[in-house]
Regions:
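AMP-binding/adenylate-forming catalytic core of the ANL superfamily
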Residues: 69, 112-122, 129-131, 275, ...
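Conserved AMP-binding/adenylate-forming core of the ANL superfamily
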Residues: 38-96, 113-118, 165, 178, ...
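Conserved AMP-binding A3 loop
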Residues: 53-58, 185-209
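ANL superfamily adenylate-forming
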Residues: 49-53, 135-181, 196, 289, ...
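Conserved pre-ATP/AMP-binding loop-to-beta segment of ANL
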Residues: 22, 37-40, 170-189, 196, ...
């Protein structure tokens, strides 16, 4: 049930209904193992959707502790190692092993190429690279060796599939170091929707408590089955889902590759109850289910964030899957969830807001110029002050200072509003805001309208440089099942709901959007590609 508050300005004080627990990832795994030693904790789902190996909580803890002892003989607490792999059980095991040994994991998208991977390894100061041989045609071992060449800090390149061989070198007399809940446990590189990635340093406490508050709001319990389709290199996969499962004691299916047809079959076969996915994944699941119906009646909860979740998509999910839907909002720098809808929220709240803040989380909407709190329903930058805020950007004090002000407020770079109930709405990114003839336009408002059109599957609205207006509004869209649609139809649809100045003047159809590793549309890439002539505007017939 939502918090009953009556605000007078766009500031939501931290709610104390959930206590912040001072535990590490390793301590949490030990606690859960005491409660559910023989309960299945982890199940492998391979690239074809076949069920592979499984671990009870007792086996997961034992395997993680054994590996942690071996790692403690190779690395010292605080050292950083890069993990470059798709979703595999070994990813989960090394996450807990590193946490137990006080080693900081640096996560890397398995789709990275040479320069991108080298940047992550070098900027983070990683002393080792853990990888797999290849993934989806990407020769990862070959690229990894090349990326580490000449980096003096890197001492080892280790195959994740050979983790069981490492413990052979463990000293039986060695003990694990003392790890504090405020210590760094992970460095996550920002997804790069607006440019160069920065490494957000996250603590045990921030990741664990955030995942627990998220799972609690979803009302997840030990009898749930959670399909982890989110990438483990992202806070959603290794944080929200993995740590949410471990704290509730439920079963996690770790899905190696997101294939919507495979995921639908997994829901039926394993009686999956809970799924977190970004909007593009949800669209794909709907399309797959329409083409090949299966029994998805076990599904209780969908949650989604990471990008705009269109109202029509939410309605379709609830209609087709007959389940509850929770929209949420956050970013890597906040471990990651800031706000989330409640399961009993109205369809209007779920469709048009991103919910109320999680427990122990202060949120305010602030003027960009003065940094003062705006009035209710006024547009400003969403700012957060909480346990979940990152420690800072790794080896980048300037960027850290730009992100977190002297009063501890983390500036998200997102624009939004807050109503008297503390429900937040997103209106766009500060950097995405379009200034047309001196008037501010918010892409999300336009995108939400377009996503109500039955033929639109995905959409991105960006500012295009213009000599007369400074910027004009460009709309880039993908249609359902690649069905053709004219610019005139979409223009008229917008005019039925928006003022003339908010209606796009440039319309481009795309087959596939440039995406980050966490499946967010890269608007700056779209804008650059348009200016380079990659997209041809549709005529206004």
């Amino acid at each position: 049930m939502s918090y009953e508050v009556q605000l007078t300005e766009s500031y939501f004080p931290a709610q104390s209904d959930g206590a912040i627990r001072k535990v590490t990832l390793g301590e949490q795994l030990r606690e859960t193992t005491k409660r559910y030693p023989e309960k299945i904790a982890l199940v492998e789902i391979d690239i074809d959707g076949l069920t592979g190996r499984s671990w009870t909580y007792r086996e997961l803890l034992s395997t993680s502790e054994t590996l942690a002892l071996a790692l403690a003989g190779r690395f010292t607490p605080g050292e950083r190692i890069t993990v470059w792999s798709p979703n595999t059980p070994e990813w989960v095991i090394i996450e807990f092993a590193c946490a137990l040994a006080g080693i900081v994991i640096v996560t890397a998208n398995p789709a990275l190429q040479f320069r991108e991977l080298r940047y992550v390894i070098e900027q983070s100061g990683s002393v080792a690279l853990f990888l797999v041989d290849e993934y989806r045609g990407n020769p990862m071992r070959e690229i990894g060796i090349e990326a580490c060449d000449g980096l003096g800090a890197v001492r080892e390149i280790i195959d994740l599939n050979d983790l069981e061989k490492i413990p052979n070198s463990a000293d039986p007399a060695r003990s694990l170091p003392t790890v504090d809940c405020n210590d760094p446990v992970m460095i996550q590189y920002t997804s790069g929707t607006t440019g160069f990635p920065k490494g957000a340093v996250l603590s045990h406490q921030s990741l664990l408590n955030n995942a627990r508050f998220y799972a609690d709001r979803l009302e997840v319990s030990a009898d749930h089955v959670w399909a982890n389709i989110m990438p483990m290199f992202h806070t959603s996969g290794c944080g929200m889902v993995t740590l949410g499962c471990v704290q509730t004691g439920c079963k996690m299916l770790i899905v190696k590759l997101f294939d919507p047809n495979v995921v639908c079959r997994i829901i039926e076969e394993h009686r999956v109850s809970t799924i977190l996915g970004v909007p593009t994944m949800l669209v794909a699941l709907l399309e797959a289910l329409q083409k090949e119906p299966v029994d998805v009646s076990s599904l209780k909860d969908f949650s989604s964030g990471g990008a705009m979740v269109a109202p029509e998509l939410i309605r379709n999910i609830q209609r087709v899957f007959s389940c509850r839907f929770s929209t949420l909002y956050g970013q890597t720098e906040t471990s990651p969830v800031i706000t989330q809808n409640f399961p009993d929220d109205s369809i209007d709240n779920v469709c048009h807001t991103i919910g109320q803040p999680l427990p122990q989380t202060e949120v305010s909407i602030r003027f960009l110029e003065s940094n003062k709190v705006v009035g209710l329903d006024g547009v400003g930058e969403i700012c957060v002050r909480a346990y979940c805020n990152m420690i800072g950007y790794h080896d980048n004090p300037e960027a850290t200072k730009d992100a977190i002000d002297d009063n501890g407020w983390l500036h998200t770079g997102d624009l939004g509003t807050m109503d008297a109930r503390g429900y937040v709405r997103i209106t766009g990114r500060v950097k995405d805001m379009i200034i047309r003839g001196g008037e501010n336009m918010f892409p999300t408002e336009i995108e939400n309208i377009l996503m109500e059109h039955p033929n639109i599957a995905e959409v991105a609205v960006v500012g295009i440089p213009d000599e007369t207006w400074g910027e004009v509004i460009g709309c880039f869209f993908r249609t359902e099942d690649s069905k053709p649609i004219s610019a005139r139809i979409l223009h008229d649809f917008c005019r039925d709901h928006l003022s003339p100045q908010k209606t796009p003047t440039i319309w481009c159809r795309v087959d596939e959007f440039p995406m980050t590793g966490s499946r967010k549309i890269q608007k700056f890439v779209i804008r650059d590609q348009f200016l380079d002539g990659v997209y041809d505007p549709l005529p206004m017939e």
